[in-house]
Amino acid sequence: MEEKKLLFNIGPIWFDGTIVLMVLLTCIIVFAFVYACTRNMKLRPKGKQTVIEWLVDFIRGIITDNLPRKEVSNFHLMAFTLFMFVLVSNILGLVTKIVVGDDLSVWKSPTADPIVTLTLAMMMIVLTHFFGMKRFGFKGYLVNSYLRPVGFLLPVKLMEEFTNLLTLGLRLYGNIFAGEVLLGLIAGTVASVGLWVIPLAIPLEMIWVAFSIFIGCIQAFIFVTLSMVYMSHKIETEE
């Protein structure tokens, strides 16, 4: 049965209520986590402060590997925020799934929706163009991004912009959506076959949840890494 959506509109624009609520919940969780981990910080970190400092250093490592060293501080906060948002978004719907009424889903991963992932991808691609123009000016940006090292590659580079958007967004969507679908199939099997499969279904569900969370972490890492790679293509001078 096709999953129903909690739709509402503001003028001519329609929204998925579940996705809106889950995105807001993701933002609240990220903010609360960072707030809790950065209260009463000490010179010698321990506990929650150790976790947040490890995450900050981890993200700094991603940026350092893909951007010039002088640019690390400029994009560190953006990359950290993006990583945390994508990570929490990936995990939310893998921990549990709530369906009420006539197959109406009220709890799912925001990144299991292609509109969310493609919007995130579009946002990052637009930001790469913005920072490229800020660095080189409009004319210099066009020359550096599309006419170097040779001008006849212009059609290929224009196509690359489109493919970068699709691969960045659809890769994330596909992995998270597939994880949720399989979890739903396992739960559906228990409901349709009978309680006697629970001893097999529970360990299988737990294993797949753990694997899906691992995949969610990897996908957050890949999304941020590719975003920084695309950013470096726009703000570094092409030889």
Swiss-Prot record:
Pfam families reported for this sequence: ATP-synt_A
Bilayer topology term: Multi-pass membrane protein
NCBIfam families: ATP_synt_6_or_A, PRK05815.1-4
Gene3D superfamilies: ATP synthase, F0 complex, subunit A
Role noted for this protein: Key component of the proton channel; it plays a direct role in the translocation of protons across the membrane.
Localisation per UniProt entry: Cell membrane
Domain of life: Bacteria
Residue ranges crossing the lipid bilayer per the database entry: 13-33, 75-95, 113-133, 174-194, 208-230
Name of the protein described by the UniProt record: ATP synthase subunit a
Main location: membrane
GO cellular component, as recorded: plasma membrane; proton-transporting ATP synthase complex
Keywords of this entry: ATP synthesis, Cell membrane, CF(0), Hydrogen ion transport, Ion transport, Membrane, Transmembrane, Transmembrane helix, Transport
Name of the gene encoding the protein in the UniProt record: atpB
GO MF: proton-transporting ATP synthase activity, rotational mechanism
Stored InterPro entries: ATP_syn_F0_a_bact/chloroplast, ATP_synth_F0_asu, ATP_synth_F0_asu_AS, F0_ATP_A_sf
Gene Ontology BP annotations: proton motive force-driven plasma membrane ATP synthesis
Subunit composition and interactions: F-type ATPases have 2 components, CF(1) - the catalytic core - and CF(0) - the membrane proton channel. CF(1) has five subunits: alpha(3), beta(3), gamma(1), delta(1), epsilon(1). CF(0) has three main subunits: a(1), b(2) and c(9-12). The alpha and beta chains form an alternating ring which encloses part of the gamma chain. CF(1) is attached to CF(0) by a central stalk formed by the gamma and epsilon chains, while a peripheral stalk is formed by the delta and b chains.
Keyword Transmembrane attributed: yes
